């Protein structure tokens, strides 16, 4: 199967944004600085952005902002730190972070692309800031309801036991 994504691309800018409450979020921009503004929201929660996610956008047409949400990837505070205070890591905080990033980059309206948990966050952002969303692309949609989380974390193993066991063997006994 051929990879349908765009060629690999490196960021032309990146940084850390202090969003308060002891949190700093890592962000990066890639593509065409004069292109149509777009935001990528990664899944997880807990993961972060990766180079392959830059390839979802045509680099000639889009100016893409990607960021590691609070507690994820290169952002600080990390949720994996023992006894980390996560009280300031809520959906409302993440929505405020997106708005801070939008203002930082001088974007009036942008296309929002979310994957998995990013679809949930993207929908919540669009509800709170509809005037700032030009279009939405939602992939691997989940609303992270209790039933969906149970499906992902337990039930899927009954249907795909071999794949589930392969996945479990790759998960460390204790996270760093």
Regions found by a protein language model. Give the residues of each.
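An N-terminal hydrophobic leader/cap segment in hydrolases
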Residues: 1-16
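Serine-hydrolase catalytic machinery in alpha/beta-hydrolase-like enzymes
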Residues: 73-82, 170-176
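Catalytic nucleophile-loop/oxyanion-hole region of alpha/beta-hydrolase
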Residues: 79-94, 147-156
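Conserved hydrolase catalytic core segment
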Residues: 108-147
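Short beta-strand or tight-loop elements
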Residues: 13, 23-25, 108
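Conserved HGGG/HGGXW glycine-rich cap/lid loop of the alpha/beta-hydrolase fold
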Residues: 18-78
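A catalytic-pocket lid/entrance helix-loop region that shapes and gates access to the active site
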Residues: 131-176
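Conserved acidic catalytic loop of the alpha/beta-hydrolase fold
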Residues: 92-110
């Amino acid at each position: 199967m051929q990879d349908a994504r765009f060629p690999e691309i490196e960021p032309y800018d990146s940084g850390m944004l202090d969003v308060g409450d002891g949190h700093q979020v890592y962000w990066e921009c890639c593509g065409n600085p004069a292109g149509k503004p777009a935001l990528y929201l990664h899944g997880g929660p807990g993961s972060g952005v990766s180079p392959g996610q830059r390839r979802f956008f045509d680099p000639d047409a889009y100016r893409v902002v990607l960021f590691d949400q609070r507690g994820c990837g290169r952002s600080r505070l990390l949720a994996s730190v023992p006894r980390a205070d996560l009280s300031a890591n809520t959906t409302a905080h993440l929505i405020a972070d997106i708005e801070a990033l939008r203002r930082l980059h001088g974007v009036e309206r942008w296309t929002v692309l979310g994957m998995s948990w990013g679809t949930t966050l993207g929908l919540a952002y669009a509800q709170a800031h509809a005037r700032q969303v030009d279009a939405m692309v939602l992939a691997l949609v989940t609303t992270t309801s209790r039933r969906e989380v149970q499906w992902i974390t337990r039930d899927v193993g009954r249907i795909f036991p071999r794949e589930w066991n392969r996945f479990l063997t790759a998960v460390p006994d204790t996270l760093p």
